[in-house]
Amino acid sequence: IAENALDKNPKNEAANLLLAKSMEKSGDKRSALLVLRPFIQNKTAGTGIYKEYVKLLTQEGKTNEVRLILKSADREVQNACAEYICETPVSNPAPGTYTTTQTLKLEGNCQKIYYTLDGSTPTRKSKVYTEPIILREGTTELKAFGVNDKNIESDVISRKYVIVLNAP
C-alpha cells in the first residue's frame, strides 16, 4: 500500500510513515530512519513522523540526537514527544550568597540526576543525587544534568553558591 501511494506522491508523509514502520517491523531500522530523515531535516514533519523518528533513534542509542532534534522542534512536536524530553534539573534555593548554611535540593522529571560540586562538568560517573546536599561555608559550584527513563540527557545546569557565615 505504501509503495503505491509513494509512486503517486513520493512526499506523502503518511505513506512514508507507513513504509518506515514496515521497515522497522522487518528489522531494518536504519532504512526506516533514512525514509523519515528528510521530513525532519526540512522541518516539514508532522508529529507522527517525529514520534516514530525519535523512537527509532532512541532504540538505536542515539539519545543525544533525540535531545537536539526535540530541543529545536516546535511546541506541538515537543508536547507529542514529551516522554523523550528530559527537562533540566531545578535547584532550590536559588544560586547566590547566603549567611547561613543552606540545604540544596535538586528536582526534575528525570530518573537520575548526576552532579558535581567543584564546577567540573558532570558525567554519568559523577555522584547521583539521592538526598539534599548541605552547603557549608565557602564557594560551591554545582553542575548537574538529568537522565530520563529513555536514557536521554538534559542540558547541564550551572549554579554558584557562596556561604559566608560570619558576615558583618
Model-derived regions: residue spans:
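Residues at alpha-helix boundaries and short interhelical turns
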Residues: 9-10, 43
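Short, compositionally stereotyped local motifs that mark structural "simplifiers"
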Residues: 17-18, 22-37, 41-43, 47-168
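Alpha-helical adaptor scaffolds
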Residues: 2-7, 13-25
